[in-house]
């Protein structure tokens, strides 16, 4: 697919009422299977902008902004993972998605795994990268020791609030550091826009505190263990992308997990950290399109 074709692709922005708030989403494509794109922290549907155009000629694509992110509403809620589940479930019911392929990264994978564990009959396939999984100890989290210390600080009362809410550290430092290329001023402006105030950044703060590490938080850890068990038992097609060295998922970890999944294809993207969509959008998009061809 050429750059001109990508630029000519029509991504339509829509908005629906969900649980007393609103959720914004990108939509493209009119024929083929439903494909749901789920982003992570602190991004939005914007991160799929150069991937969806590869897929939309053969699929109906939907990329929501999670509640509290992007152009979606910011209701007065705790923004725990359970809240994200409630709003995503209601969003999918509102727009009428039933059977679907899910493409996910970061916290989008935790949402995808949890949805697939509860509704396996609705899953046509699952493509994912840099995924959330239960980590028995901090050595299992991230490829860089300094990142582990940083996320410990995010989870520390007072320190996390100062760094993420007041200093906007996740947007200004974590995001650009986890992309191999330099994000443009326009791209950074798009990612900054949803979070102009400390209060607006609460959703960003809550996700690091929900990471299932060393048995905590207990409810999240138990849920993620159950969801991983369901994922290993499932036989729907899977497509696992990984970068080198990766962030949450190294090439070695990706290979190990893939060997424990049924019907899982591995795709090596080359140099990359966490936000692989920003470094390899066209490779990811083309691979998803070819994979969906095999599904249908």
Regions from the PLM with identified roles:
Residues 27-71:
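Conserved HGGG/HGGXW glycine-rich cap/lid loop of the alpha/beta-hydrolase fold
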Residues 272-285:
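Catalytic histidine-centered segment of alpha/beta-hydrolase-like enzymes
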Residues 44-45, 110, 272-273:
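A short, glycine- and basic residue-enriched loop/turn
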């Amino acid at each position: 697919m050429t750059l001109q074709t990508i630029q000519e692709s029509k991504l339509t922005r829509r908005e629906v009422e969900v649980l007393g708030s609103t959720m914004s989403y990108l939509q493209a494509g009119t024929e083929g299977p439903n494909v749901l794109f789920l982003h992570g922290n602190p991004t939005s549907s914007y991160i799929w902008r150069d991937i969806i155009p590869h897929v939309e000629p053969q699929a109906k694509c939907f990329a929501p902004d999670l509640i509290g992110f992007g152009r979606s509403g910011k209701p007065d809620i705790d923004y725990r993972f359970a809240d994200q589940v409630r709003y995503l479930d209601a969003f999918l019911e509102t727009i009428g998605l039933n059977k679907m392929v899910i493409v996910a990264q970061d916290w989008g994978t935790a949402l995808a795994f949890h949805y697939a564990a509860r509704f396996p009959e609705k899953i046509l396939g699952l493509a994912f990268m840099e995924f959330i999984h239960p980590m028995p100890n901090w050595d299992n989290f991230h490829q860089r020791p300094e990142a582990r210390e940083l996320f410990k600080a995010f989870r520390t009362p007072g320190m996390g609030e100062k760094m993420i809410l007041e200093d906007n550290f996740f947007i200004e430092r974590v995001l650009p550091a986890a992309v191999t290329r330099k994000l443009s001023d326009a791209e950074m402006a798009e990612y900054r826009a949803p979070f102009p105030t400390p209060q607006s950044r609460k959703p960003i703060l809550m996700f690091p505190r929900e990471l299932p590490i060393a048995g905590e938080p207990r409810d999240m850890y138990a849920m993620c263990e159950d969801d991983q068990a369901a994922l290993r038992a499932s036989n729907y097609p899977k497509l696992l992308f990984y970068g080198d060295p990766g962030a949450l998922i190294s090439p070695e970890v990706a290979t190990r997990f893939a060997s424990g999944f049924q019907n899982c294809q591995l795709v090596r993207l080359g140099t990359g950290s966490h936000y692989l969509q920003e470094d390899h959008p066209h490779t990811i998009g083309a691979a998803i399109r070819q994979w969906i061809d095999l599904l249908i």
